[in-house]
Amino acid sequence: MVQSINIENPELILATSGESFHWARRFLGAKMGHDAARLYSFCRVLDDMADGDIQDGPEHLVEIQAKLIQGQWGNHPLLDQFSDMVDEYGLSTNVVSSLVEGLLDDQADEVLIKDEANLIQYAYKVAGTVGLLMCDVLNTDEPRAKPHAIDLGIGMQLTNIARDVLEDAKMGRRYLPGTWVDNMTPQQILEASKNPYSHEALLITEAVHRLLSLAEDYYASGRRGLAYLPVRAHFSIGVAAKVYRQIGIQLLKSKDSWYGQRQVTSKASKVFCTLRATMSLFRRFPHPRKPHNTTLHTSLAPYKNQGGIWG
């Protein structure tokens, strides 16, 4: 939780709010790592605005969105702080606008994701966009990296949703597609958590497993794009992906799944994931690379090629 628009120490924000990314950041080097931390802190402040952790946060989001829609990057304290990164890396206002759009979607009195297409669109807006922005910060000018970066962000967001079903329900949000859970309301999810063997609770458990299976498709695509990144970025993002994916693996193994204790990764798990990530470096050796699976983006037509051609 940031609680302030002024970002004086992005490294501290990353350390306290993004354990998986903070662990992976150490492999990026000084300049790239610091800029990645700045991008994370920027996105984190936007997220905390959406959650009301920053005073007048939703009002700030509306103001920022109005600036971005007009193609402006400035005239707001948060935007002003990151204008140098926009200039250096050519960050897309359209991509950031889609990120803010997703966070504004969360301002509804009750958030109810309709179906899988709606879910993927939401995940693109709040996480796939971050993948696109990170591509620029990690100094890759290879357009084929972009669709894979989007998919890695989506995979991580699906894991996040699976982990936070109960926490989101307490805030009046249901990100599990209504078509998967008989259009249960957040209140019904809360009630189901009290009786894990009820029909409703078992339906939610099945939906969480289905969500994590869907996430695997996006993680697989994300991994295929790592070889387009500079070598240190390849390794660092590979580590972050494996650490985040580990949360889903633990959820599947957990006896109390979505209604139990919130899943986190231990230091031992992070070390294990780091060792496994070294294997991904072999993908850098020349070999025929599979084209991107475009069916993963069937729902993303309204956002196609934001921030440049997607491969």
Give short role names for the model-derived ranges.
Residues 1-155, 162, 167-311:
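Catalytic cores of Mg2+-dependent Asp-rich isoprenoid enzymes
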